[in-house]
Amino acid sequence: MSRYTGPSWKQARRLGLSLTGTGKELARRNYVPGQHGPNNRSKLSEYGLQLAEKQKLRFTYGVGEKQFRNLFVQASKIKEGILGFNFMLLLERRLDNVVYRLGLATTRRQARQFVNHGHILVDGKRVDIPSYRVTPGQVISVREKSLKVPAILEAVEATLGRPAFVSFDAEKLEGSLTRLPERDEINPEINEALIVEFYNKML
């Protein structure tokens, strides 16, 4: 299954979860899209619940199925900690996600575009790979030629608050992941245990 590139609002309504972090997708129509949407949230089987939870997390970070599964396998090889949370930490450390958390982009999709287009530096070097794994303490900044890109400036201005696990200098347009987040600081609406159960059956 490839990465979803369709309308994020429609996908958010299908999953019952905001994918932009604003909640606007669900503000007016908190039901699945389609003619029978308001009455179409049928009871899911155990497998259906696990699959739905996996899709929620995957679409939240905008990651393709193959890459998502590979990250789970990597998380399963980490000896310390809890598998489900370790998996979420690997997703959090993606460069596109850190760019989003810093407020340099309004959505993860936009952050991924900024990385792909070469606007983002890591410790002063351009990195155009959205899946690049950020280490706490690395400096994420905007390259000099991109400092006046309107979309980036608008995103910074629109950001009202940032997570406690990042730091950001609005004048320099740079910041860092200061530490790994705690479980209660990310995706409280996700039940990662269901995702672990899903992949334990599949792998």
Swiss-Prot record:
CDD domains: S4. One of its GO terms (biological process) is translation. The keyword Ribosomal protein applies. It comes from the Bacteria. GO terms for cellular component: small ribosomal subunit. Residues 93-156 form the S4 RNA-binding domain. Keywords: Ribonucleoprotein, Ribosomal protein, RNA-binding, rRNA-binding. GO terms for molecular function: rRNA binding; structural constituent of ribosome. The keyword Ribosomal protein applies. InterPro entries: Ribosomal_uS4, Ribosomal_uS4_bac-type, Ribosomal_uS4_CS, Ribosomal_uS4_N, S4_RNA-bd, S4_RNA-bd_sf. Part of the 30S ribosomal subunit. Contacts protein S5. The interaction surface between S4 and S5 is involved in control of translational fidelity. One of the primary rRNA binding proteins, it binds directly to 16S rRNA where it nucleates assembly of the body of the 30S subunit. Belongs to the universal ribosomal protein uS4 family. This is Small ribosomal subunit protein uS4. It comes from Streptococcus sanguinis (strain SK36).
